[in-house]
């Protein structure tokens, strides 16, 4: 069942944990692609020097961060890789959760082709293990790009997140990745992942 807006109307720190184990879905050319969310990071604009909206920054690029909970914020890093985030809490407060890694569940053949431009039978074991183990990788595998920016994940669109409460797991809290510039914020334990899951980006 698709997650509705009330789920996202909490702090990014809460939602980042709640999203672990949930299922990220995208429909691509009639094929359903699904992956279990196994790693997330929380960003809180007001107090977080790692956030694009730190200090109330409002540029055209970051305005989606101020959107209503349950909408997508998709941006480019290094000019070539997309990152997919979900807006949380309340409209106007710039809180969001970065989806860092997923465990492929359905439509894996299509994911492999999107990632490597060849059939799954022709990719190596290393390539398969790296299919969705990072924010840019999962966006390629699920065909998420800037066209999904500001998309409402709670309506009838092709991109959304489903409930999945069948699995029990431990959550590891750690420092976020790649934000060495963020002064004291680089030490916040705002990265969360499922303990011992092989699909996380790094331990």
From Swiss-Prot:
- The answer to keyword DNA repair applying to this record is yes
NCBIfam families linked: 3mg, PRK00802.1-1
HAMAP family linked to this entry: 3MGH
Q: Which family does it belong to?
A: Belongs to the DNA glycosylase MPG family.
GO BP, sorted A to Z: base-excision repair
What protein is this chain from? Answer: Putative 3-methyladenine DNA glycosylase
Keywords carried by this UniProt record: DNA damage, DNA repair, Hydrolase
Q: Which GO terms describe its molecular function?
A: alkylbase DNA N-glycosylase activity; DNA binding
Tell me which EC number(s) this protein carries: 3.2.2.-
């Amino acid at each position: 069942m698709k997650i509705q807006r009330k789920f996202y109307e909490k702090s990014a720190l809460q939602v980042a944990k709640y999203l672990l184990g949930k299922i990220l879905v995208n429909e691509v050319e009639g094929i359903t692609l699904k992956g279990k969310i196994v790693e997330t990071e929380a960003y809180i604009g007001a107090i977080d020097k790692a956030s694009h909206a730190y200090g109330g920054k409002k540029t055209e690029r970051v305005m989606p961060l101020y959107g209503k909970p349950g909408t997508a914020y998709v941006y480019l890093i290094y000019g070539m890789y997309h990152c997919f985030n979900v807006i949380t809490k309340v409209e106007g407060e710039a809180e969001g959760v970065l989806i860092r890694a997923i465990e492929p569940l359905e439509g894996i053949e299509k994911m492999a082709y999107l990632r490597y431009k060849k059939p799954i039978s022709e990719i190596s074991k290393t390539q398969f293990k790296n299919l969705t183990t990072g924010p840019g990788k999962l966006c390629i595998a699920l065909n998420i790009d800037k066209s999904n920016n500001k998309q409402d994940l709670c309506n009838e669109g092709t991109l959304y997140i489903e409930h999945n409460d069948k699995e029990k797991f431990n959550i590891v809290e750690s420092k976020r990745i790649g934000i060495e510039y963020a002064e004291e914020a680089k030490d916040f334990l705002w990265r969360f992942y499922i303990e011992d899951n092989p699909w996380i980006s790094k331990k």
